[in-house]
């Protein structure tokens, strides 16, 4: 049918005639010059053969390649650009690879099995965490003896400080991969663990958070799993459903505080910023919601810190250790937006995640810090329909579908966006599709949209980043980190310390000077805002 193609060509002619597309892009010299500059930069790349003092892994939960592309366009359009020519912070990382995300038992994985792969270096089974594939989902008696050790745990044993930052609950599958061993990723609190499993000795994830290893910084959501049943939540005291859930009567926050003389617990943004500036604070736990943290578009900026602010606070504390640090940073609600088939939520979460990556890059040095950005898995999220460049990423394709109705350029293969109106697919308008609450249409009706099984990108910068190349198993990521920092099982890595130091554990440039003006200014504003 010629109709859609004719409309597309007419639209393109109109777009060019209106001057939307930069006129210089019509000249081949523009593209040749751009490519020559990129080639020149590539020729200057020199692998950093030194050891990494610090390790940061940024995990975009559910951030497949289509999500990265769409978020890049959205970030540009928010700055009044056409979109695709924009660079995300992660795009600037010089080394890129693809990661195969399958679990031992599934083509398409969950976040528990993938966390085991990229944090522990071993593939496991669907919905298990920190266990080899010899462990079976929901079978407590297969836990013991099948535990695998995370890079974060190895970093702690090597004398480094370690931290976990996430926009989900801190007991969620991705961050739990750094410290927990469980046959069921949903065992957040002891109330979620069957009595039979508790009798067999299986611990809930919240208990493991404070008992399995000494984590210096813990920031995210998940308050309700740390307190006894009936404990009112400080932010929602009248909502019983948001209060403590524990059946064992334990106050895990108090138990954690008692372990460390310099420990501090906070539950709002003001307390976080104050604690991060206090030199007496050696350990910091911040739990800012009963469950997952709010989406960025719903965040109360007076109470809830952004992912970037949590990352800054974590870096401020962790960088005090002259032996270096390991930091896990997760943009966890990208995944949740996709499961809801709400692309607006997923993409704005991706941009917030990218902002945290950019800020961390400003506060650390690639001379001594290996930074990796990746996803645990993708989603059945597509971007197509021949939209005109510069048109809204949330807009409509220029042509109609065979049912003579409009369709959006962003769609899902399955999910809750499958809706029938009078027995047919409903028409959609530009104003509807641009709403933050809009669910993109799906081909198959499901209560929740599913993960996808294609490879995901890995971006790398810093010492040993050149090892990130080609198409690799997801487990390779953990091994690159361990080798770069000379952690088990690569303690005999034979890597030289970075220039200007006598050993790889020597302190490098501190993030403290860069952070102090920002945090002090923020606290001053907060004090002014709350003054009577």
Curated annotation (Swiss-Prot):
Binding-site residues for Mg(2+), renumbered to this chain: 61, 174, 330
Glycosylation sites: 141, 268
Zinc keyword on record: yes
Organism for this UniProt entry: Homo sapiens (Human)
Activity regulation, short description: Inhibited by L-leucine, EDTA and heat.
UniProt remark on cofactor binding: Binds 1 Mg(2+) ion.
Membrane topology, as annotated: Lipid-anchor; GPI-anchor
Catalytic class of the enzyme: hydrolase
Name of this protein: Alkaline phosphatase, germ cell type
Gene Ontology molecular function terms on file: alkaline phosphatase activity; metal ion binding
Other remarks on this protein: In most mammals there are four different isozymes: placental (ALPP), germ cell (ALPG), intestinal (ALPI) and tissue non-specific (liver/bone/kidney) (ALPL/TNAP).
GO cellular-component term (any): plasma membrane
Chain positions covered by the region annotation Disordered: 422-443
Keywords in alphabetical order: Calcium, Cell membrane, Disulfide bond, Glycoprotein, GPI-anchor, Hydrolase, Lipoprotein, Magnesium, Membrane, Metal-binding, Signal, Zinc
Ranges of Polar residues composition bias in the record: 431-443
């Amino acid at each position: 049918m010629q109709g859609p193609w004719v409309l597309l060509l007419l639209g393109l002619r109109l777009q060019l005639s209106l001057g939307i597309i930069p006129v210089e892009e019509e000249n081949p010299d523009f593209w040749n010059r751009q490519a020559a500059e990129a080639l020149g930069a590539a020729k200057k790349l020199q692998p950093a053969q030194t050891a990494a003092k610090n390790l940061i892994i940024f995990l975009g939960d559910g951030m497949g390649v289509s999500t990265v592309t769409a978020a890049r366009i959205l970030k540009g359009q928010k700055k009044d650009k056409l979109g695709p020519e924009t660079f995300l912070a992660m795009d600037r990382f010089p080394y890129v690879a693809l990661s195969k995300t399958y679990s031992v038992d599934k083509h398409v994985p969950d976040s528990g099995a993938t966390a085991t792969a990229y944090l522990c270096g071993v593939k496991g089974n669907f919905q298990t965490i920190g266990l080899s594939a010899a462990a079976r989902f929901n079978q407590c008696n297969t836990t013991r003896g099948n535990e695998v050790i995370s890079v974060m745990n190895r970093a702690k044993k090597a004398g480094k400080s370690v931290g976990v930052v996430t926009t989900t609950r801190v007991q969620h599958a991705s961050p739990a991969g750094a410290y927990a061993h469980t046959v069921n990723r949903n065992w957040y609190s002891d109330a979620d663990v069957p009595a039979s499993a508790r009798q067999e000795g299986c611990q809930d994830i919240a208990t493991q958070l404070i008992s399995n290893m000494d984590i210096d910084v813990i920031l995210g959501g998940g308050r309700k799993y740390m307190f006894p049943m009936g404990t009112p939540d400080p932010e929602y005291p009248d909502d019983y459903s948001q209060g403590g859930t524990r059946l064992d009567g334990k106050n895990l926050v108090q138990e954690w505080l008692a372990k460390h003389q310099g420990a501090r617990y906070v539950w709002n943004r003001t307390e976080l910023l104050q604690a991060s500036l206090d030199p007496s604070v050696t350990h910091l736990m911040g739990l800012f919601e009963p469950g997952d943290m709010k989406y960025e578009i719903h965040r109360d900026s007076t109470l809830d810190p952004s992912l970037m602010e949590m990352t800054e606070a974590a870096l401020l504390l962790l960088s005090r250790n002259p032996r270096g640090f390991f930091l896990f940073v997760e943009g966890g609600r990208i995944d949740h937006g996709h499961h809801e088939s709400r692309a607006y939520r997923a993409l704005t979460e991706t941009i917030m995640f990218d902002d945290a990556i950019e800020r961390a890059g400003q506060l650390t040095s690639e001379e001594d810090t290996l930074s990796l950005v990746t996803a645990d898995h993708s989603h059945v999220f597509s971007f197509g329909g021949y939209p005109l460049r510069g048109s809204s990423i949330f807009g409509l394709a220029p042509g109609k579908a065979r049912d003579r109705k409009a369709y959006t350029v962003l769609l899902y293969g399955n999910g809750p966006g499958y809706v029938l109106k009078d027995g047919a697919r409903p028409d959609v308008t530009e104003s509807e599709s641009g709403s933050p609450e809009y669910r993109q249409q799906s081909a198959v009706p499901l209560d929740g949209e599913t993960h996808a099984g294609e490879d995901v990108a890995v971006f790398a910068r810093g010492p040993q980043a050149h090892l990130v190349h080609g198409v690799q198993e997801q487990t390779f990521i953990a091994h690159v980190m361990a080798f770069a920092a000379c952690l088990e099982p690569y303690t005999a890595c034979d890597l030289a310390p970075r220039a200007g130091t006598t050993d790889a554990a020597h302190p490098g440039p501190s993030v403290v000077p860069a952070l102090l003006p920002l945090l002090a200014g923020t606290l001053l504003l907060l004090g002014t805002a709350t003054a009577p």
